[in-house]
């Protein structure tokens, strides 16, 4: 796994959920550019924030790293 995988996975799961980066950022309690900063490589979430992101995206941390979770997108 690498940072690009994490960034792409957040994007793929967010799209699957049908929410914008802006909406996801605000619903997680951050500035409107929070998710955009993560997926563009300007920042990474802390472990605690990663767990919140997984919860928001309705996936377990294990499923987050499982390629079959978003198969068919």
Language-model features and meaning:
Residues 23, 34, 63:
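Residues in the helix-turn-helix
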Residues 29-45:
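Recognition helix of helix-turn-helix/homeodomain-like DNA-binding domains
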């Amino acid at each position: 796994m690498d940072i690009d995988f994490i960034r792409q996975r957040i994007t793929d799961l967010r799209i699957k959920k049908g929410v914008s980066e802006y909406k996801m950022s605000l619903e997680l309690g951050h500035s409107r550019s929070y998710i955009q900063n993560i997926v563009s490589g300007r920042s990474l979430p802390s472990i605690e924030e990663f767990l919140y992101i997984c919860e928001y995206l309705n996936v377990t941390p294990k499923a987050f790293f499982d390629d079959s979770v978003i198969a068919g997108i």
